[in-house]
Regions:
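Short, low-complexity, polar/charged sequence segments that are solvent-exposed and flexible
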Residues: 71-75, 96-98, 117-118
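Short, acidic, Ser/Thr-enriched surface-loop or helix-capping motifs
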Residues: 111
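N-terminal beta-strand motif that seeds the catalytic metal site of vicinal oxygen chelate
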Residues: 1-20, 73-80, 120-122
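Mid-chain, well-packed structural core segment of small domains
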Residues: 65-90
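Conserved short beta-strand elements that form part of the metal-binding/catalytic scaffold
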Residues: 30-70, 116-122
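Core segments of cupin and vicinal oxygen chelate
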Residues: 3, 10-52, 85-88, 92-108
């Protein structure tokens, strides 16, 4: 028997609602804010139970990748059908394509808060 259920993934950021909106739009999910929340927490939720959470951090500093001055501690990989089309779409949402591209079957981007994430063909 499992001790726990699927964990939520929580990303630190300066603006939880803005980053939840970015990921919810990219994944075609819904943004959920708690009624008693003061804006320091937001969630992007799918219809089938998956969730990304976003927590406000005062004086947030984005990770520096691929360097290690402020290393990333995790990153998200999302599967897409077409790297060019998906890349253009996430840039339109506010992402930035990273200058360092170490592979051919994925592309590295930075979300609006500076977290690295990858668009992957599989």
């Amino acid at each position: 028997m499992a001790i726990a259920r699927f964990p939520s993934i929580v990303l630190d950021c300066p603006d939880p609602v803005a980053l939840a909106t970015f990921y919810a739009t990219m994944l075609d999910w819904e943004v959920k804010k708690h009624a008693d929340d003061d804006g320091d927490w937001a969630e992007a939720r799918s219809d089938y139970g998956q969730c990304l959470c976003f927590q406000q951090v005062v004086d947030y500093a984005a990770p520096v990748w691929p360097g290690q001055d402020r290393p990333q501690q995790m990153h998200l990989d999302v599967v897409v059908d077409d790297l060019d089309a998906a890349g253009a779409a996430v840039v339109e949402l506010g992402a930035t394509q990273h200058e360092h591209q170490p592979g051919t079957t994925f592309r590295v981007f930075l979300d609006p808060a500076g977290h690295p994430f990858c668009l992957c063909l599989s």
